[in-house]
């Protein structure tokens, strides 16, 4: 079959492999790129190429991640694979690689293991919306009943963490056999089956521009005779001249109207997701708006002070704290563009948190922040990043 030119016209989806160490995440990643490149074009990557993951920084945290891409019949996928467990934890908490869905790799020979559980929990906490399972190493299991047993265990585990275990696609195969070009059910055909499951089970994500307008406030100026201009990068949605806007966070929510949008000193009739713009606000005084607030479509986001979060605490080697912290620890939480002090409540039975740990906590901020589940933040002490987190559930 002739390789067609690599086209960007297909919808773009972000995925990644998760699962226990040595269950075959990287081998599967290599197999997917190789098998799909043969059929749909794109670049095959070897195990060694994927395994030598380069370092990258996200929110002041160094993470090793490999990025590959591949085509299926319907879509173009960007796929992340991490070499170590700590890299997965950091990746998922910082949102460095935002996933529209995850491929959970479980060894059919071993069944679910501690990190299988931890990655499913993390996926739930950080808002990975869909999981598909690849039961790997099926060539090492002769007993069909054992395969069924492992499949049942995986489904139960997914259901336990509020994923639809009974409806989750589970593909049985051997990534190694697929890499070797094996044509039996567990070889190459299992990769096509996985690709078809990705295409049908993970819905196309909403594009940023289709969301409700949101723009974090970076700077505020007053222009004599024109009013107050707020600058920032539009995170999602579109803002048009004449539309109502709410100013949310830090202070009581106020309403105003957008009377102008400018970009590179030119006036526009609208600004959209990704644009760095200045938004002119009617009748708003300069001191009524500050960095750390957001401009938003009315009624779409609310300010909160108390929430549960999944956090990762940097190790000493990563430039983090050298000592553990305890109940009532009060660092700054950096949301979007500003720091807000808050107190951390540890879960029952947890005395302290060591550098390098990840933990579920409850946070009480001293001032409200425009917040929704899945919002990322950094934890800082005097401007130095000591951790990262993601809002799991809003309390008040």
From Swiss-Prot:
Residues 10-206 form the tr-type G domain. Mg(2+) binds at residue 26. Its main location: cytoplasm. Residues 81-84 are annotated as: G3. Residues 19-26 are annotated as: G1. One of its GO terms (molecular function) is GTPase activity. Transmembrane segments: none annotated. GTP binds at residues 19-26, 81-85, 136-139. Residues 60-64 are annotated as: G2. Its EC number is 3.6.5.3. It comes from the Bacteria. It holds the Pfam family GTP_EFTU_D2. Keywords: Cytoplasm, Elongation factor, GTP-binding, Hydrolase, Magnesium, Metal-binding, Nucleotide-binding, Protein biosynthesis. Residues 174-176 are annotated as: G5. Residues 136-139 are annotated as: G4. It catalyses: GTP + H2O = GDP + phosphate + H(+). It is found in: Cytoplasm. GO terms for cellular component: cytosol. It is an enzyme of class 3 (hydrolase). Monomer. GTP hydrolase that promotes the GTP-dependent binding of aminoacyl-tRNA to the A-site of ribosomes during protein biosynthesis. Belongs to the TRAFAC class translation factor GTPase superfamily. Classic translation factor GTPase family. EF-Tu/EF-1A subfamily. This is Elongation factor Tu. It comes from Nitrosospira multiformis (strain ATCC 25196 / NCIMB 11849 / C 71). The lineage of its organism: Bacteria, Pseudomonadati, Pseudomonadota, Betaproteobacteria, Nitrosomonadales. The gene is tuf1.
